[in-house]
Amino acid sequence: MMDVSSWKEMEVALVSFDNADQIVEDPCYSNDLSPASQSRKGHPSCANLLSNWRILINSENANNETIFSRFSAEFSEHLVGERVGMEEGDQRVIINIAGLRFETRLKTLNQFPETLLGDPEKRMRYFDSMRNEYFFDRNRPSFDGILYYYQSGGKIRRPANVPIDVFADEITFYELGDEAMDQFREDEGFIKDPETLLPTNDFHRQFWLLFEYPESSSAARGVALVSVLVIVISIIIFCMETLPEFREEREYKSTQELSKNTTDTLLAHSTFTDPFFVIETACIIWFSFELFVRFIVCPSKTEFFKNIMNIIDIVSIIPYFVTLTTELIQQSELNGQQNMSLAILRIIRLVRVFRIFKLSRHSKGLQILGQTLKASMRELGLLIFFLFIGVILFSSAVYFAEVDEPQSHFSSIPDGFWWAVVTMTTVGYGDMCPTTLGGKIVGTLCAIAGVLTIALPVPVIVSNFNYFYHRETENEEKQILPGEVERILNSVVTGNDSMESLNKTNGGYPRDKAKK
């Protein structure tokens, strides 16, 4: 960078005393003293300096040295003021986004030096020296929100005509940081990604990765495969034991043993030797072992019980122990509490069906579906609320439309709730239907209202699903080997070293100063 003395030498070569008379005689300069126009920081412009210089030359008792010294001092002061203004970040920067030019001040970008536009070394890669501007072949509508981030001091807002995934890519490209991305996701209604916690103990960490992260190693994938097979076997057993042939066989054996006045020990022995019970016991042993190991090595016991997957694991093994306890109690109370115990068992055994949700631990698709439903709770709540209003409205209307019909299925408004629900959801079982003209008109309106009501939140839910699906896909693509990470880091360091020799303009970062 040139210092003030270099600027003086250059100006002496351009404006010397040999051509001073030509400048005075130039018709472009008037003889009248024009008011001095102020440049930046209140200093006179170069045109006014030349005009004042002409007056000094024509004045009496003025010599060349006095004229030049005054001009040089005033022009030097002007350059110093311009340089101070440049250092303070008052200069304007032109940013070209795929042909659309934006103009802002350098100090606006310097508020966030860690970003692409705020770091001189990073943005210099996109500088066009011929046009004196920065060129980015990126999405143009998105840059309104990116530039607003700098102008507002860190507030991120997505333009209405820009898709969510496109704007998220722009935030990543301009390196606005994780805080800006988290703020954007929060504004869009997405759930913040939880921080991944790992045990501090090396031994615990290995077992935690083995049982919690199937993609971490081959052994972890093997454990996940065994877990999936056990879950599938458990679900198959749960379904097959309800088949009539197996159920009747067990009931027949139990009746035969009771008629022969067998002892309690024989009854318990018959229950515990049942093939379904044996297979169920083997599955429960694996589930209990898996749950126990994860609880011992987990990094936070509090977070362990807050995880919905761990709660499902606990709930899925409770029915077995309740069944086992009930069978043991029946040894002493065969007649008294047997009916009550059977009722309790039927209810508790129903909980076993929740084991199917254990598959979501090993299925990315089920995890994405769960995240989508969690992020769309507000829309689902609105859907249920609209359906509730429609059910009340149309069940009341169909009741009063069918009240005079002797063979009507709608004897009361609550009886019409079921009909309104299946009609608004376009299921239409046909067990209840209106017969009068007024009732059919109400049914038609109910079906149309149901279609419109259900269609309203569907685009939002689909958008959320696409967001989580693309995010999961991008995370899988970004998984690279440690050797590639080191190679990329070395290339970045080499690239940064090569950038230091560049003399950046238009908001650049001058690293090489001219020696005085």
Swiss-Prot record:
Residue stretches spanning the membrane: 223-244, 276-296, 308-328, 344-363, 380-400, 441-461
Tissue note: Detected in brain, cochlear sensory epithelium, cochlear ganglion, tegumentum vasculosum. Detected at low levels in cochlear lagena.
GO biological process entries: action potential; potassium ion transmembrane transport; protein homooligomerization
Membrane topology: Multi-pass membrane protein
Record motif Selectivity filter, residues: 426-431
Lineage: superkingdom: Eukaryota
Signal sequence region: none
SUPFAM superfamilies tied to this protein: POZ domain, Voltage-gated potassium channels
Compartment(s): Membrane
SMART domains: BTB
GO CC field: membrane; voltage-gated potassium channel complex
Reaction catalysis annotation: K(+)(in) = K(+)(out)
Chief localization: membrane
Positions annotated as glycosylated: N261, N339, N503
Domain notes: The N-terminus may be important in determining the rate of inactivation of the channel while the tail may play a role in modulation of channel activity and/or targeting of the channel to specific subcellular compartments. The segment S4 is probably the voltage-sensor and is characterized by a series of positively charged amino acids at every third position.
Protein's recorded name: Potassium voltage-gated channel subfamily A member 10
Lineage, highest ranks first: Eukaryota, Metazoa, Chordata, Craniata, Vertebrata
